[in-house]
Amino acid sequence: MPNCFKFHTVIERHWQKPYPVLSFLLKPLSGLFAKIAAKRRTDFLSGKRQSEKLPVPVVVVGNIHAGGTGKTPIVAALVSGLQEKGVKVGIISRGYGRKSKAVHVLNAESRAEDAGDEPLLLFRKTGAPTAVGSSRAEAGRALLAAHPDIGLIVADDGLQHYALRRDVEIAVFPAADTGRTDLDLLPNGNLREPLLRLDSVDAVVVSGGKADALFRPSENMFHSRIEAGRIYRLNNPSEILDTGRLKNQTVVAVAGIAKPARFFDSLRNMGITVKRTVALPDHADISAADLPDADAVIITEKDAVKFSDGICTDNVWVLPVCAIIEPDLAAFVLERLEDVPKAV
């Protein structure tokens, strides 16, 4: 396991700053991957492979990267924006990292092992009916059966899940990659599909910063930024942390997300002195036993949902975040669709 983790770390560094030797070895494999991915998409679009259309409009929010684009807060913001406009929204997702493969419609008792950490976070954050399943169409059918008043479904991820037809495609693209010329497909790079794929989506949302001036793959460009909320106690979310009291305390930050440095930087930007940081693999299981000793341990919202039954210690705090998308992405989606029913 340690050797596998070390190899994965080397590959991820290579994706950010390519090593010439690795590029020489991996480039042919990326060429093969590109051909397979292109044929698969063509087969679905031509009807050679079957795809399913759900009885309500489907909006896919995904990416051409292999994770780490800041998509989950954007999905939450879009769903909330649609809800504010009176739309009854449902969410479907694969539910990466969960222990079961069965379709699961989330409820108040759902845990991360049932649904996956990101779908559970979206469900709790937005209150939108949510279902998970490796087949998005099957998850969508189950969701509509449980909540027949849903007027629109947002598919979290699944841009490459062509077995489900979609009415609107939204691709999230990290600002840090908008000026790069060395991006490549897996395994030489971290792209699932080539940059040209962005030409065919309905909109591109640039996340995490300002895009390069020459980056404009779509007529419909949006930008998102993350705003940190008020830190609250895990065992009592109504209790807000007075960060001033941390001045003489030992603070440790723990994150099991794709880009933990963003989380750690957010805390420092809030004026919090973090003595130690603990970066866990994305979607990693985490329990109270994994948390280090400290006066205060601050974790992400995504990790917080893994403590479904709470924990015995009172020194664990949660930093919530939200995405601000400009211009109005929810309004754009409704303009692309016709006659989306509003909630009664």
Swiss-Prot record:
Reactions this protein catalyses: a lipid A disaccharide + ATP = a lipid IVA + ADP + H(+)
Catalytic activity, EC: 2.7.1.130
Pathway noted in the entry: Glycolipid biosynthesis; lipid IV(A) biosynthesis; lipid IV(A) from (3R)-3-hydroxytetradecanoyl-[acyl-carrier-protein] and UDP-N-acetyl-alpha-D-glucosamine: step 6/6
Entry keywords, A to Z: ATP-binding, Kinase, Lipid A biosynthesis, Lipid biosynthesis, Lipid metabolism, Nucleotide-binding, Transferase
Annotated binding of ATP, by residue: H65, A66, G67, G68, T69, G70, K71, T72
Top EC group: transferase
Key word Transmembrane helix present: no
Family, per entry: Belongs to the LpxK family.
Function of the protein: Transfers the gamma-phosphate of ATP to the 4'-position of a tetraacyldisaccharide 1-phosphate intermediate (termed DS-1-P) to form tetraacyldisaccharide 1,4'-bis-phosphate (lipid IVA).
Protein name, UniProt field: Tetraacyldisaccharide 4'-kinase
The species this protein was found in: Neisseria meningitidis serogroup A / serotype 4A (strain DSM 15465 / Z2491)
Gene name of the record: lpxK
